[in-house]
């Protein structure tokens, strides 16, 4: 199984999807340009890569594109079957925050990070003024 930059297992079988996901992940977490493009390329390489859709949803959310974020979240949900428990929990955290359920999102993020402390994309939700503590 392929892993991301932080060593988390990814439900994708293509190195190209993983590589683009990692580029998007690092761009997103460092607030640099290119996250949306990289996550989009990851989805093009593997249309069943749930985490790439979630990265895209988060990128859209951060740029104020809420309708696009909801569409990407819906696509992630459609391809969740067969993913890991971490990826399903990752989806839940994103779904809660994107639907405005901040208290539930905060609790879900704490649980997720307790179970998977190397999942920086989710940990970031509670560690930034642009996240749940802002």
In which residue ranges do the predicted regions lie?
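TPR repeat positional signature
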Residues: 20, 53, 89, 123-126
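Canonical positions in the second alpha-helix
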Residues: 41-42, 75-79, 111-112
């Amino acid at each position: 199984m392929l892993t991301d930059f932080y060593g988390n297992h990814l439900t994708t079988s293509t190195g190209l999807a993983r590589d683009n996901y990692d580029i998007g992940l690092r761009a997103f977490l460092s607030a640099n340009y290119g996250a949306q493009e990289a996550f989009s390329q990851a989805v093009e390489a593997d249309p069943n890569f749930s985490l790439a859709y979630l990265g895209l949803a988060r990128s859209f959310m951060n740029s104020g594109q809420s309708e696009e974020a909801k569409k990407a979240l819906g696509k992630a949900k459609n391809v969740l079957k067969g993913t890991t428990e971490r990826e399903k929990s990752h989806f839940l955290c994103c779904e809660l925050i994107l639907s405005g359920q901040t208290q539930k999102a905060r609790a879900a993020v704490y649980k997720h990070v307790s179970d998977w402390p190397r999942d920086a994309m989710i940990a970031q939700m509670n560690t930034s003024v642009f996240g749940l503590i802002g």
